Amino acid sequence: MLLATLLLLLLGGALAHPDRIIFPNHACEDPPAVLLEVQGTLQRPLVRDSRTSPANCTWLILGSKEQTVTIRFQKLHLACGSERLTLRSPLQPLISLCEAPPSPLQLPGGNVTITYSYAGARAPMGQGFLLSYSQDWLMCLQEEFQCLNHRCVSAVQRCDGVDACGDGSDEAGCSSDPFPGLTPRPVPSLPCNVTLEDFYGVFSSPGYTHLASVSHPQSCHWLLDPHDGRRLAVRFTALDLGFGDAVHVYDGPGPPESSRLLRSLTHFSNGKAVTVETLSGQAVVSYHTVAWSNGRGFNATYHVRGYCLPWDRPCGLGSGLGAGEGLGERCYSEAQRCDGSWDCADGTDEEDCPGCPPGHFPCGAAGTSGATACYLPADRCNYQTFCADGADERRCRHCQPGNFRCRDEKCVYETWVCDGQPDCADGSDEWDCSYVLPRKVITAAVIGSLVCGLLLVIALGCTCKLYAIRTQEYSIFAPLSRMEAEIVQQQAPPSYGQLIAQGAIPPVEDFPTENPNDNSVLGNLRSLLQILRQDMTPGGGPGARRRQRGRLMRRLVRRLRRWGLLPRTNTPARASEARSQVTPSAAPLEALDGGTGPAREGGAVGGQDGEQAPPLPIKAPLPSASTSPAPTTVPEAPGPLPSLPLEPSLLSGVVQALRGRLLPSLGPPGPTRSPPGPHTAVLALEDEDDVLLVPLAEPGVWVAEAEDEPLLT
C-alpha cells in the first residue's frame, strides 16, 4: 500500500510539471478556434507529453469594425527565443510579445487574431500566459471626432478633404473650403533614413521638436553602426507616440525582419525611459506613424558599451559587464544622482548623498521622507525590507549570497528556487527548472524507503529463522559429530547406593546398599525386611534396648505402615490375645511360610523372636442382614491346638498386601462353597489375609510412635 501511494505521488508530480503540455486540437490545428463570446479568457495550453514537437495555436475573436477589443494580461512569461505571442487586428500592425505590457492593449477593427507559437526541439519554455479579452464600443475623447462607424479620428481630420473614418462621415456636411485653423501645416524636412556612425549620438523622430500632423502614414529608419564590435545601448529618453504609432528596434543591419526584432514600443510605453541593448555592434531603429497622428514621436540616444555620453557620469568599476547588470547602464545622468534608485549596479549614483554617513545609501530622493533613512550595502537585496517604501529591495542587479535574483529585479531566498511554489512576483524562480519533485514528495519517498527497508530486514530475519528450524529437524537423522556424540552419550552419574557399594563414600547407618546382582523389586523388599528384622529387640522384653534407625529409614517405615504395606507393632498383651485365638487350621501356615520346626523353635511367643513379625488377626465374617439374630451363646473352649507360628513372615505379609491392593479381583472362582474344614480354614485364612491387609493399630500406640519423631511431609 505504501509503495502504491509513493508511485501515485510521483506520477502526480510528473503530470503537474509545466514542461508537460498538450495543445487542444480546436486551437492548434487548422482551422483556428473562433471565439464568439463578447468576453472571455485565454491561456497557453498545458503540456502533457514532451517538448519535442513545435506548436502553432491560433484564436480568432470575432467582432464588428465599430468595436474595440481590449486585452488585459494577468500573466505573460514566455521564453523569447523559442516562444512568441502575436496579436493582429485590421487597424493595428502586428504586435509580438514575450513579456506582459505595462497596460491593457486596445485593438480596433473588430476581428483580432491571437497566435501562440513554440519552436519545439526541447527548447526552453516560460510560465505561459493568461489573458482576458472584452469587446467594447470605442468612446472618443473630447478632442476627437466620432464617426458613424464608431471610429474615433482626430478633430483636425474633420472636413479636411480626406475620408479618415472610412465611411465618409468625417467629411459629411462640410463646405468646399475647409476651416483655416484645421488645415495641416507643412512639415519641414527632417533627417530620416540615415546612418549614424559615431560612438555615441542623439536622434529623434520627425516632428518631435514641434507638434505637426501629417495627412499620410510615415516611416523612418536609422542605422546605428559605430564600427565597433561591442554592443550598443539605445536609450529612449522620451516617448510620445500616437495611437497606432510604433517604434521597432532590430539587431544588426539589413531590412527589418521579425527574427531580429529586439523590442517594439507603442503608445502604451509613453512617459517611460526604455533602454534596449543589442546583441551585436549594429542596430536598426524603425519608426511608423499613421495618418494624422497626434503623437510627437521619440527622442533617443545611443552609445557603445564602455563609453558614456559627455553629459553623463560613468558608474564605478563594480558596474562592468556581467550577468544581472541590466541593459548596459554603466552611465547615469545628473537627474539620476541621489534619487533613491540604483541606476548603477554598484550604487555609485547613490553614494555620498546628503544626509547619510559615508558607506550608507539613502532610502529616497532629497526632499522626501525616505531621504533621512540610510542603510548599509549588506542590507540591500537580501529579501529583508529595510526602507519603509522597500527602496533597498528594488532594481537589484546583484543579490546577497544565498539569494536568487528574479527577472523583475527582486531577490528571494535561493532555497526557494524550483521548489514548486512561485515566490517571485513574476514566478521566474520556477522558470527553466529541471524536473524536481517537491520537498514533501521527497520526504515521503525517503520515509517510505526506510520503512520498506525495515520490513525487508524483518522478512529476511524470519526467513533465516525458519530455514534454521527446518535444517535442525533434518539434522536429527544426520550422523552426530564427535563433540555432539560426547555430549549426548555421556554416562549417567552413579546413584548414592552404588557409591556406597563401590566404597567411594562412607556408608550411612541403616541405608540399604544396592546389590548389582539383584535389581528386582522383590530383592529390594527383602533388603528392607532384613533391616526391619534387625530392628526388632533381641529379648523381646519391654526393657530391651531398640536399635536406633536412621531418620530416612524411620520416615520410610512410617509411610509404609500408614499405607498398610507393613503391620503395626503390637504390645505383649495383644500378642498373647492373638495366640489364644489361633485355630488348628493355622498349622499349614508354617508350610506356607517355608519355615521348619527346628527353625521355628528359636522364636518365642510375644515377640521374643526378633525375626518374626506379629501375627495378623483373623477377620470374622459380618452377619447377614437377612438372617435373624441368634441367641447369644458362649463358645466352648477349643481343645489343645497344635503349635502354630504366631507371627507370619513379614515378607509374606507384604507380598499379600501388595497382591490385595494391586490385584483385588483375584480369587478362587466358584458358585458354591464346601463346608469349612481344616484345609479350608487355612485357605480362608490366606484369603482373609488377601482381603484384609493390616489392621490399624491402637491410637495410643500410633500416637506414641508418632511422638517418637515428627513426620516431615
From Swiss-Prot:
Glycan-linked positions: N56, N111, N193, N299
Domain (CUB) ranges: 28-136, 192-305
Record has Cytoplasm as a keyword: no
A Pfam family recorded for this sequence: Ldl_recept_a
TM stretches of this protein: 441-461
Signal peptide: 1-16
Stretches the record annotates as Disordered: 564-637
Stored SMART domains: CUB, LDLa
Extracellular topological intervals: 17-440
UniProt-listed SUPFAM superfamilies: LDL receptor-like module, Spermadhesin, CUB domain
Annotated Low complexity bias: 621-636
Compositional bias per record (Polar residues), positions renumbered to this chain: 569-584
Segments on the Cytoplasmic side according to the record's topology features: 462-713
Domain of life, per lineage: Eukaryota
Location in the cell: Membrane; Membrane, Coated pit
Assigned keywords, A-Z: Coated pit, Disulfide bond, Endocytosis, Glycoprotein, Membrane, Phosphoprotein, Receptor, Repeat, Signal, Transmembrane, Transmembrane helix
Summary of the function given for this chain in its UniProt record: Probable receptor, which is involved in the internalization of lipophilic molecules and/or signal transduction. May be involved in the uptake of lipoprotein APOE in liver.
Stated family: Belongs to the LDLR family.
Record-given protein name: Low-density lipoprotein receptor-related protein 10
Taxonomic lineage from the root: Eukaryota, Metazoa, Chordata, Craniata, Vertebrata
Gene from which this protein is expressed: LRP10
